[in-house]
């Protein structure tokens, strides 16, 4: 269980770095925010790429498992940053995605 918590926490930090790296350009392009926001966006995406190298599995498995956590963090972002109420469908989808992540991340190793 400790390994799952460690992996999930690393995935969550990775997801935040990716979301920030994509959200800031969105603010520039859609929200008319200053262009200098592209600098921290690029740094955040570089951090995201580096964080992916810290995950314990092969790249493909890491990306597959990461997707589940990304969905949960993106929904949290939707609620906290965008102020949109989550639906029971959001919660059910996140639960399914996180269950899939756990299966991939915690499978027995040969």
From Swiss-Prot:
Give the InterPro entries listed for this entry: UPF0060
- Kindly state which keywords UniProt assigns to this record, in alphabetical order: Cell inner membrane, Cell membrane, Membrane, Transmembrane, Transmembrane helix
Gene Ontology cellular-component terms for this entry are: plasma membrane
Pfam families per record: UPF0060
List localization entries: Cell inner membrane
What stretches pass through the bilayer?
9-29, 34-54, 66-86
Q: How does it sit in the membrane?
A: Multi-pass membrane protein
Lineage top rank: taxon:
Bacteria
Protein family per UniProt: Belongs to the UPF0060 family.
Protein name, per record = UPF0060 membrane protein Bcep1808_1236
Origin species: Burkholderia vietnamiensis (strain G4 / LMG 22486)
